[in-house]
A protein has these predicted regions:
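Short acidic-hydrophobic surface loop/beta-edge motif
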Residues: 3-7, 26
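A short, structured beta-strand/loop element
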Residues: 14-47
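C-terminal structural segments of small proteins and small subunits
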Residues: 47-74
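Charge-dense, helix-prone N-terminal extensions
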Residues: 9-13
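Intrinsically disordered, low-complexity and often Lys/Arg-enriched segments
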Residues: 1-3, 72
Length: 74
């Protein structure tokens, strides 16, 4: 499970051989949220508003890299 980014209080991970659609896991000590890479839709879970804003901005800014990494790991 590669950690793609670390922030204060949470990280963004991608798991090997994970289910579709392509997504990342936004994980903190007491929360987890799955976010679709292509459109930024929240697939499941919830996180604090500050975490959500930071994660969504990072996912949007790194969408091409994330899709390439998804193809590499699946």
């Amino acid at each position: 499970m590669p950690t793609l980014a670390r922030f204060a209080g949470f990280e963004i991970d991608m798991y090997f051989e994970d289910h579709n659609p392509p997504h990342v896991h936004v994980v903190g000590r007491e929360f987890e949220m799955l976010v679709a890479i292509r459109d930024g839709a929240v697939l499941t879970g919830a996180v604090p508003p500050r975490v959500r804003r930071t994660a969504m901005r990072w996912i949007e800014d790194n969408r091409a890299m994330l899709l390439a990494k998804w193809d590499e790991l699946q």
